[in-house]
Amino acid sequence: AGTVWYYDKSAGDWRSQALGDGLYASPVVVVELASGQTYFLALPRTFALRENGSREYFPEQDGILRTTKLRDGGVRITMDGYGLAPGCVTDALVLTAPFGLDWSVDNCAKAWVTYVKNGDSHWCFDGYFRKSPSNYIPSGENYYYCCAASYCIRGYLGRMSRCKEAPALVILSLDTMSQWQNQYGYVPTTPGSEWLQGDYGIGPGFYDTRFNTDLLELYISATRRLGKGMFEETMNRYLAFFSQVADTSHIPTETGGWLIPDYWHPDEITAPHTSLNHQASECLALYHAADLLNRRDLRALADRMLLAIVDTGSGWVMPNHNLYYSIKPDGTYVEGDYPYLTYNDLYDLRKYLSSSERSELETLTYLMGEKLQWMQNTGVTGYEKG
């Protein structure tokens, strides 16, 4: 006796039924036995290994779960996958626990499906893979690349207080992502980018400051919840790399601030731009890391980056009150800011700094006010409201 939980794609919701003879095609199936023993199963998916570390996903080859009642009253649980062609891999996950999931809350099975059901992302055996943009090399309808910003882990972190399975998934996934850290200390975006290649001579395996900053914040959040030591080496290696890039590649501002370019590559030809969302999020992550690790050097670097935002201040504001997206090393501003992402980054940075009476708060408040006016005039939603 027991219960099977599965995600019904056609209904867009979870279903449960008594454990017996059954066939299930779902990104995640949870089997709960009457004894309390639970199986968390991410069913097999098939990928072809493509150039530059990319994957091509074959949805028509998704695996299934088969449950069969036995004569002795037991149940056989079988995961079926497809035979593999040369150059292909398949992966699946099975977690077991002596207790059931809490279906009254937004548990980790629900979180997993959130990131898989629309086809935009997959957790694979070796990392978090997002759909490749059309200007990545290679790209295609079902092409994916390993993204440092593993947003599914954020979902598990947010459920740690109420889901017993969350800590295991956090540890497993963050440890897996740490294996992607290269000899320099960052997690590379392995595909090429036509845009970065054309504008800056930046090839495959480039450093994206935003993606790596978001991953750093995940390590910081996990360390706060799980205790120091588990991921400290990974964080310190990355922070040493970031500090070196900041020291050698920064663009100085009027009173000594440092703008940090959005991208880096050991073979880059031209220094890239700095976007406000990257700069603000990196600044906040450095403050968080400084607090966690008791590092004055990181706080000093964050202060320099914050000073760069103050120095450039009103230069970010467009005539229509929107913000420019980025600034080039020659001081030219470039349009194309996100609808609300940059506002939220400024909001989070200001919130962190608000406990102290710092003069920089005035600039952050001004930039947020201008962006807010533009968002309200154009009907943008999704921004933080404090």
Residue ranges and their predicted role:
Residues 268-331:
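Active-site/pore-lining binding-face segments in mid-to-C-terminal subdomains
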Residues 148-151, 165-172, 214-217, 230, ...:
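Extracytoplasmic/secreted proteins, especially bacterial periplasmic and envelope-associated proteins
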Residues 183-238, 245:
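Acidic/His-rich structured neighborhood in mature extracellular/periplasmic domains
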Residues 122-142, 186-208, 251-275, 318-346, ...:
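Carbohydrate-binding/catalytic loop surfaces
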Residues 88, 139-159, 204-223, 271-290, ...:
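Well-ordered alpha-helical segments within folded domains of soluble proteins
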Residues 108-140, 167-189, 229-255, 296-322, ...:
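Long, well-ordered core segments of solenoidal/helical folds
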Residues 218-232, 244, 248-257, 261-284:
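Flexible, surface-exposed loop/gating regions in the mature catalytic domains
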Residues 1-182, 227-229:
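Carbohydrate-recognition beta-sandwich/jelly-roll modules
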